[in-house]
Amino acid sequence: MNINIIEIELSSLCNAKCSGCMRTILDNQGKYYLKDNLKFSEIQDWFDKIDLTKTKIKMCGVLGDPIINPDLVEIIFYFLYEKNVRDIEMSTNGGTRHLDFWKHLGLLSKNSDKRFYIHWAIDGATRNDYRENVSLEKVWENVNVYNEAGGHSIWQYIIFDYNEHEIDLARQMAKEKGMKFATRKSWRNNSKFAKIKSRAAKEIDSETYEDVEKRAREKNYEEAKIACRHKIKGEIFIGVNRRLWPCCHLYDEQVANKTRDIENLFTNIGHNFNNLKKHSIEEILESEWYKTTLEESWNNMHPLHIPRCYLTCGDDGKRAVIKNVE
């Protein structure tokens, strides 16, 4: 398959404690997850023989923030200049590291003709309630140094009830700082138990996360109608656990470990089928599960059916994130 988008979780570590983050949830429950960073040498090994000239790299992830990874700058250089990727989009809360680090990234962005750019996850103009443990003052110091060095920036603003009235102010601030502005509505924030509420999430689907999750787990639907990013957009996800998944959602399903669905998959087709320590990216993508079984398993009667596919991407993708870049 053509790999158009690769999302890479460079770290499972983070300075923040966002209430909706899987890492925060696992920490609060005292549950295990791998606390680690991907190494530059691993990135080189995995991608050495793959043509990435038409590929977008997304540095984001489920658990951590890429700026925690000590090899980050080397990895960015590798993708930009050795692999000559189309572009690199890095998402960060921006609340840590020294100013020299951010100046360096700004120069990297400028000198790459802005093929490297940053999505700053800042959810408010004067307050940043969702990003717990993150100093907004420190964030703006880092943003300003990066921008002044010539870095390309997008301010990504998740709409919550507490910050909805500040959207116009944030838009104006972004303009003054030379940043693009993007609002983001995420249906997962329509949870009965969400600490930070979002009316905007209900515009995506009025049903709560728990209601749809219950229907998915009970297989209470006739046709899944999966809008799969892997199949439609040619997207793959690599987690810090060195597993290659079609998307971040199935990786999240694995680390959350709420059900036996992923363990059932491993039991039936082998625990190492998507393990990058055992197989190359090409070998994994040519496996029977990726080529045929994944799509077949969207049928809720299939023995390897994973309800998470319906929960996040079913009903023709109606619960997908809505992102509007201005």
Kindly give the residue locations of the regions a language model identified:
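A C-terminal junction/extension of Radical SAM enzymes
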Residues: 1, 151-154, 162-255, 301-318, ...
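Canonical Radical SAM [4Fe-4S] cluster-binding loop centered on the CxxxCxxC motif
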Residues: 1-40, 247-249
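Flexible mid-to-C-terminal extensions adjoining Fe-S/redox cofactors in radical SAM and related proteins
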Residues: 1-4, 24, 28, 243-244, ...
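Exposed loop/turn and edge beta-strand positions of beta-sandwich/beta-sheet ligand-binding modules
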Residues: 4, 53, 232
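Generic structural signal for small/hydrophobic residues in well-ordered secondary structure
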Residues: 6, 10, 14-15, 65, ...
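A short, conserved beta-strand element in the Rossmann-like catalytic core
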Residues: 19, 66-67
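A short acidic, helix-capping loop that chelates divalent metal ions and anchors anionic groups
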Residues: 27-31, 126-131, 193-194
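Radical SAM/AdoMet-radical enzyme domain recognition
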Residues: 37-60, 69-186
